[in-house]
Regions:
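NAD(P)+-binding Rossmann beta1-loop-alpha1 motif at the extreme N-terminus of oxidoreductases
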Residues: 1-52, 56
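Hydrophobic/aromatic beta-strand patches that form the interior of the parallel beta-sheet core
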Residues: 30, 72, 88, 138-140
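Short glycine-/acidic-enriched loop or helix-start segments at secondary-structure transitions
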Residues: 18, 98-99, 125-127
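Rossmann-fold dinucleotide-binding core
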Residues: 117-153
Length: 154
């Protein structure tokens, strides 16, 4: 399966960074959070980071604009996972919260969608057992968001 569309759940430090590097890699990204104000702040941070790359001549203005155009901020979960291939969850490291997110996600995502948790401290198998098809669940951990393309898969 080729991945073209990614949904990132959570727009905090990790979520907005994952969205940025995914868009920089050419993927279409939906950045989803529970309130618009969180999304607005995340998009400001992404734009600031990209502006810095432009000022250092790492990317052009045109590339910056194309990257930003590939990120769609969204509050509605159903809409956020529509047509997605991969969901990367980056919500706070609270097991009950992650389980709640995946229980909701399991109800609305298509059967082909891969679920990925960015957790660095919680057991992946415990989170994966929340969904109906745990075999489509992976752990993926990003490092140095926005500066490197390094990630760990569990």
């Amino acid at each position: 399966m080729e991945i073209k569309n990614i949904t990132v759940l959570g727009s905090g430090i990790m979520g907005h960074g994952i969205s940025q590097v995914s868009a920089m890699a050419g993927y279409n990204v939906v950045l989803r959070d529970i309130e618009q104000k969180f999304l607005d702040k995340a998009m400001e941070k992404i734009k600031w980071s990209l502006d810095k790359l432009v000022s250092k001549e790492k990317i052009t203005d045109d590339e910056r604009n194309k990257i930003i155009s590939r990120i769609i901020p969204m509050v509605d979960l159903n809409e956020a996972v529509h047509n997605t291939d991969l969901v990367i969850e980056a919500v706070p490291e609270i097991m009950d919260l992650k389980k709640k997110v995946y229980a909701e996600l399991d109800k609305v995502a298509d059967n082909h969608v891969i679920f990925a948790s960015n957790t660095s401290t919680l057991p992946i198998t415990e989170i994966a057992n929340t969904v109906s098809n745990p075999e489509r669940f992976i752990g993926i951990h990003f490092f140095k968001i926005g500066r490197a393309s390094c990630r760990e898969r569990v």
